[in-house]
């Protein structure tokens, strides 16, 4: 296998900082911009440097310093409008979206962006996000 072939297969992505504070649970202080202007600059920089994907996380509340959160699907759609080639992957909790509504949103976003929208279905791990929104919490072994 040639080295050139391997290089063609490598794809780069980054995690969109659409929450305040930080992106991961950590005792280490984290500071990222989370406003739209910062994210537009970051998305365009990533796109211009060969990144193919960006993943927008979903949070409705967080205990790790991410006090404020932008909703992942609408934030991703806005970033798609600010870029030309970058593909946006929006994380969603399936229990909080009716499947038909998510399918319709996703199909529309994909058409509007020229095929650059995708969904990452996640199980979620903050119990309060579900219970505070009136959804049942299933233990992860259920």
Regions found by a protein language model. Give the residues of each.
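Hydrophobic residues within beta-strands of alpha/beta enzymes
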Residues: 54, 88, 117-119
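Active-site-proximal glycine-rich helix-loop-beta segment
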Residues: 50, 84, 113-115
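N-terminal beta1-alpha1-beta2 module of alpha/beta enzyme domains
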Residues: 1-82
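Glycine-rich "substrate-gating" loop/helix at the edge of Rossmann-like oxidoreductase active sites
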Residues: 63-67, 93-98
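Flexible, glycine-rich active-site loops centered on histidine and acidic residues
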Residues: 7-33, 95-142
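Short, well-ordered alpha-helical packing segments
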Residues: 40-43, 77-80, 93, 103-110
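Conserved catalytic cysteine-centered active-site region
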Residues: 82-90
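Short linear capping/connector segments at secondary-structure termini
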Residues: 57-61, 92-93, 134
């Amino acid at each position: 296998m040639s080295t050139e072939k391997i290089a063609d297969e490598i794809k780069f992505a980054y995690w969109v900082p659409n929450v305040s504070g930080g992106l991961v649970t950590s005792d280490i202080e984290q500071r990222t911009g989370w406003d739209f202007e910062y994210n537009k600059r970051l998305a365009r920089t990533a796109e211009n440097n060969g990144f193919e994907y960006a993943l927008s996380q979903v949070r409705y509340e967080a205990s790790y310093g991410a006090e404020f959160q932008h909703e992942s699907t609408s934030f991703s759609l806005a970033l798609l409008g600010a870029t030309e080639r970058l593909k946006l992957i929006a994380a969603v909790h399936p229990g909080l979206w009716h499947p038909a509504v998510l399918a319709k949103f996703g199909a529309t976003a994909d058409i509007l962006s020229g095929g650059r929208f995708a969904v990452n279905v996640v199980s979620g791990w903050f119990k309060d996000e579900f219970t505070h929104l009136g959804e049942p919490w299933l233990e992860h072994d259920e």
